[in-house]
A protein has these predicted regions:
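Charged/polar, solvent-exposed surface patches and flexible loops
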Residues: 9, 33, 125-129
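Extracytoplasmic electrostatic interaction patches
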Residues: 80-144
């Protein structure tokens, strides 16, 4: 089962790290910018692909679109973070198979953005074929 953290706690854990080295501080700033900053990105929803920027490093999608991700014509080589939107409470019962992301060579982070209240454990239970190369974190916004 993956270790799922609230996004701010995840970034804080990077900042505190084992020691406050320049590497851990700059890494936490990089991740913070990756999560909250505007980056070249791909939006993949309902089979439609929209790419913004030359070398996208961020992919936005939703639970319903995940099944089509492997066959979609996406620029996968430089994606470092995938933002998955949870729109309804029924989405929380969906499974996210991390094997679908195996073609994303630089992928390190999976960010769950939920419109419904949920827990770290509920999000962790959504994942299949967990691989420790991915850090998984979440945020709840505009919860019903």
């Amino acid at each position: 089962t993956p270790n799922v953290m609230y996004v701010n706690a995840f970034i804080s854990s990077l900042k505190s790290g084992n020691a406050k080295t320049r590497v851990s501080v700059s890494n936490s700033q990089y991740v913070e910018n990756l999560v909250f900053g505007i980056q070249p990105a791909i939006y993949f929803n309902s089979g439609t692909v929209k790419t913004y920027g030359d070398i996208p490093i961020k992919l936005f999608t939703d639970i319903a679109s995940l099944n089509g991700i492997s066959s979609a014509n996406l620029l996968k080589d430089d994606i470092e973070i995938i933002v998955i939107k949870i729109k309804s409470s029924t989405d929380l019962y969906s499974k996210i198979d991390l094997l679908k992301f195996s073609e994303f060579n630089k992928l390190k982070y999976i960010y769950i953005l939920s419109n419904v209240s949920t827990t770290e454990q509920n999000i962790a239970n959504m994942f299949l074929n967990y691989n420790q190369q991915y850090s998984i974190f979440y945020k709840i916004e505009n919860a019903e």
